[in-house]
Regions:
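Well-ordered secondary-structure scaffolds
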Residues: 2-187
Length: 187
C-alpha cells in the first residue's frame, strides 16, 4: 500500500507501444511523477498512438494524456509541478538516471537484451518481455506473450517470442509472406 502523499519517481525506458501502455496505466493509477526515456530515432508501428512520437513532433497525445519532449531534467521537474504533461527525454543510454534517482525503473523497450540493466538502477527494476532474467538483471520481469501475459516473474525469464502470432489455435496459417524481395508501393 502506498503512503498517503508519497508518489515515487518512475522512469520508463521506451515510449513505444509497451512503454506508452505502462505510462498510461501508471498515470491513471495516480502515479504522476513519470519520465519517459527514448532514443533519438524511435521506431513504432502505430506512430499515432505512442508517446515516442513526441521525439519528432515535440509532443504526442494518447487517450487524452500528452507527453512532451523536454531538453533536460529541469524541464521534467517543471512539468511535474504543473501536471500538464508527461516529460519525455531523448536519453538512450540513461545518462539522466544519475540526476533523476528514480525509485522505480521500467524497461519497456522489448529489446530482448539486458542492455545495461541492473537491479541497482532503482529500488525496483522491472523489464517487459523475453531475454532478461529476473533475479539477475532486474528484480522482476513481466511476461509479454502467451497464456501468462502480464504475470510478474521474480526468477527466470519470460517466454521467448516465436514471432508467429497465434489466435484460436492457428499460428503459421495466419502469417502472410512476400513471394519475393523488394519494395511494395501502393497507388
Amino acid at each position: 500500500m502506498m503512503q498517503k502523499g508519497f508518489c515515487p519517481l518512475i522512469v520508463i525506458r521506451g515510449a513505444g507501444d509497451m512503454g506508452t501502455g505502462v505510462a498510461l496505466e501508471l498515470w491513471h493509477a495516480g502515479l504522476h511523477r513519470l519520465v519517459l526515456l527514448e532514443c533519438a530515432r524511435p521506431r513504432a508501428i502505430r506512430r499515432l498512438v505512442v508517446f515516442s512520437e513526441a521525439v519528432f513532433e515535440g509532443k504526442a497525445r494518447v487517450e487524452g494524456l500528452e507527453a512532451r519532449l523536454c531538453p533536460d531534467t529541469a524541464a521534467c521537474r517543471a512539468l511535474w509541478q504543473t501536471g500538464e504533461a508527461l516529460p519525455l527525454l531523448v536519453d538512450e543510454d540513461g545518462a539522466s538516471l544519475r540526476e533523476l534517482c528514480p525509485q522505480v525503473f521500467v524497461d519497456a523497450t522489448m529489446s530482448k537484451k539486458a542492455r545495461g540493466l541492473s537491479p541497482n538502477m532503482a529500488d525496483l527494476v522491472i523489464a517487459l518481455g523475453p531475454g532478461i532474467e529476473a533475479g539477475r538483471d532486474v528484480h522482476c520481469v513481466i511476461e509479454s506473450f502467451g497464456p501468462d501475459m502480464g504475470r510478474c516473474l521474480r526468477q527466470g525469464q519470460a517466454l521467448a517470442n516465436t514471432g508467429i502470432p497465434c489466435e484460436h489455435g492457428r499460428s503459421e496459417q495466419r502469417v502472410g509472406r512476400a513471394p519475393c524481395a523488394g519494395v511494395f508501393a501502393s497507388p
